[in-house]
Regions:
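Second-shell loop/turn segments in exported
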Residues: 4-13, 72-79
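Intrinsically disordered, low-complexity
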Residues: 1-6, 24
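Generic alpha-helical secondary structure signal
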Residues: 13, 17, 81-84
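Secreted/periplasmic proteins that engage bacterial cell-wall peptidoglycan
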Residues: 11, 17-56
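Catalytic cores and adjacent binding grooves of peptidoglycan-active enzymes
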Residues: 55-119
């Protein structure tokens, strides 16, 4: 395995562990969380970009992003503000953590790691 691949695997492991911490924290707060999309194939990223529903270089391509599904009192939350507590907690967990609710076009259920060079 090349060193670049080893680094990517370590980043993916760090992301997965940090995501677990967020989900456990959310459960302690009385939230119900399920997983949405984590890995996105390149062809799907290109399709989403052409439809203006995503970007071609999404962190999902490297398994460094997850779309979470938040349920409060059994009701799925679709609006970004419902995810604000999760987003704030996520950003506290790791310097690489970025929340989609902070994007110019907010994507509240999106949680990702950015490359360490960009931190």
């Amino acid at each position: 395995m090349a060193s670049g691949n080893s680094l990517r695997v370590q980043q993916q492991a760090d992301f997965a562990r940090t995501l677990c911490h967020l989900i456990l924290w959310a459960q302690q707060q009385g939230m119900t969380i399920t997983l949405g999309e984590v890995e996105r194939p390149p062809i799907l990223a290109e399709l989403y970009a052409s439809m203006r529903k995503g970007i071609k270089d999404s962190q999902h391509l490297d398994r460094l992003a997850a779309d979470l599904r938040l349920y409060l009192s059994g009701v799925y939350q679709e609006d970004t503000p419902a995810y604000a507590r999760l987003g704030e907690q996520w950003k506290k967990l790791d310097k690489r953590a970025r929340w989609g609710g902070d994007f110019p076009k907010p994507d509240g259920n999106h949680f990702e790691f950015i490359d360490e060079e960009r931190v």
